[in-house]
């Protein structure tokens, strides 16, 4: 018996540097949940996809470039979200003023997901988060 989970499903899409891309990425995630028979944690996943896609658009996608969304589900029920961009810059969770309406995206991702992180690559970076317990119904 193999002790390592195997990939069960995967879906990838590229999105242009356009504010409408966040909604389209969220829609793809919603359709993917339905296609894969997932219901648990959908609201958390959708919010994290929105936050990571928004961060990519605001801070990581140079003009004329795209960002990439990867969704994957393994046999252990771990759903992984990855957003890749080609822009420079470090990812950090900022100190946010209580009255500020911005700067909470990565704090939300950290709070809602079971794990998250950043992997640097040339060019750009991959910001990812994982959700356990996402088995098909």
Indicate residue ranges for each PLM-predicted region.
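Conserved beta-strand-loop-beta-strand hairpin that lines the nucleotide-binding pocket
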Residues: 1-12, 57-137
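STAS-typified acidic loop motif
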Residues: 12-24
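Preference for short coil/turn "hinge" residues that link or interrupt alpha-helices
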Residues: 15, 31, 54-55
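Conserved short strand/loop->alpha-helix "switch" segment adjacent to the catalytic nucleotide/phosphoryl-transfer site
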Residues: 23-50
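Histidine-centered phosphotransfer motif of kinases
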Residues: 44-62
């Amino acid at each position: 018996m193999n002790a390592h989970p195997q990939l069960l499903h995967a879906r990838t899409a590229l999105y242009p540097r356009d504010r409408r891309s966040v909604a389209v990425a969220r829609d793809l995630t919603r359709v993917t949940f339905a296609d894969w028979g997932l219901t648990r944690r959908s609201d958390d996943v959708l919010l994290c996809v929105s936050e990571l896609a928004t961060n990519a658009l605001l801070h990581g996608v140079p003009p004329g470039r795209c960002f990439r969304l990867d969704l994957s589900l393994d046999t252990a029920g771990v759903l992984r979200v990855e957003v890749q961009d080609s822009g420079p810059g470090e990812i950090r969770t900022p100190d946010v003023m209580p009255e500020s309406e911005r700067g909470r995206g990565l704090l939300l991702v950290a709070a809602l997901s079971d794990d998250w992180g950043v992997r640097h690559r040339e060019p750009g970076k991959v910001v990812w988060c994982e959700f356990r317990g996402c088995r098909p119904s």
